[in-house]
């Protein structure tokens, strides 16, 4: 019985627009990633090859907000763009998991 009450309380706190907002934030992350890739003077195909990805279209999916940078290759992605992995991951966390970002770094941190 207690468990059901806990689940009910949790369900009441879920954001109603989680999916559309999430897609919008992924698109903003993708725009940022596209700018960083352009700064590094890499095409989508170049970056995909350097990351060992089979299809360059995955880069397009990420940049257009349809997918996220996988955690397993986040460090390599940062390095290929000439960025430090920790700040890169932190910046993406702000888009991919805004509530987790707020809990870890505070609302004012960017």
Model-derived features: where do they sit?
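Short, basic-rich loop-to-helix N-cap that marks the start of a DNA-contacting helix
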Residues: 65-79
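Recognition helix of helix-turn-helix/homeodomain-like DNA-binding domains
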Residues: 52-69
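Key DNA-contact positions within bacterial/archaeal DNA-binding proteins
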Residues: 45, 56-57, 86
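Residues in the recognition helix of alpha-helical DNA-binding motifs
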Residues: 36, 50, 61-62, 91
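A short, Lys/Arg-rich alpha-helix, primarily the initiator
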Residues: 3-39
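Core residues of bacterial helix-turn-helix
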Residues: 40, 51-52, 62, 81
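Short basic helix-loop element that most often maps to the first helix and adjoining turn
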Residues: 30-50, 76, 108
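Short, charged recognition helix plus adjacent turn
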Residues: 3, 79, 87-110
């Amino acid at each position: 019985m207690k468990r059901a009450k806990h689940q009910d309380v949790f369900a009441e706190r879920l954001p109603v627009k989680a999916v559309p907002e999430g897609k919008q934030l992924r698109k903003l992350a993708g725009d940022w990633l596209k700018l960083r890739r352009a700064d590094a003077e890499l095409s989508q195909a170049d970056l995909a090859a350097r990351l060992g990805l089979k299809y360059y279209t995955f880069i397009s999916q990420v940049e257009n907000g349809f997918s996220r940078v996988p955690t397993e290759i986040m460090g390599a992605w940062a390095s290929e763009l000439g960025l430090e992995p920790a700040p890169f991951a932190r910046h993406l966390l702000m888009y991919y998991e805004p509530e987790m970002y707020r809990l870890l770094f505070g609302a004012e941190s960017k």
